[in-house]
């Protein structure tokens, strides 16, 4: 059972910064919004996870089924990515947070290069190499 207050969610939506939202939630004794709890519960029930792609102009989250391998996840972006999959460069979300940038992760030797059998993990930051 997930209890959600429409008024509380509306109040959160009106706040501009992440910090303001966190302070508001803390004042209510909450760790996260009802919407976030609902989304997490739905993802869990449907066996879904998220990987991330990031470029200079855009960062995007992509939904996939838990247990999918790298080529299948590449296909979520475009079928040509799956057909011509070569490899995936992978940064673990926690490593990105710790080091602060792709360059710093690479310099620390924490960027992985994975093949067709790699099972994508929730939160992985992916860069797919392909040839069609």
Give the ranges of each region predicted by the language model.
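C-terminal-of-GTPase-core extension/linker across diverse P-loop GTPases
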Residues: 1-121, 126, 131
């Amino acid at each position: 059972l997930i209890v959600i207050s429409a008024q509380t969610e509306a109040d959160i939506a009106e706040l501009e910064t992440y910090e303001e939202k966190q302070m508001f939630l803390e004042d209510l004794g909450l760790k996260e919004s009802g919407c976030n709890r609902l989304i997490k519960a739905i993802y869990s029930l449907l066996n879904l996870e998220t990987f991330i792609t990031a470029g200079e102009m855009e960062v995007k989250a992509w939904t996939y089924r838990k247990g999918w391998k790298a080529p299948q996840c590449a296909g979520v972006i475009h079928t040509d990515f799956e057909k011509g999959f070569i490899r995936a460069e992978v940064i673990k979300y926690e490593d990105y947070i710790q080091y602060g940038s792709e360059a710093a992760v690479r310099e620390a030797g924490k960027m992985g290069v994975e093949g067709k059998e790699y099972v994508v993990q929730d939160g992985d930051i992916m860069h797919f190499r392909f040839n069609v």
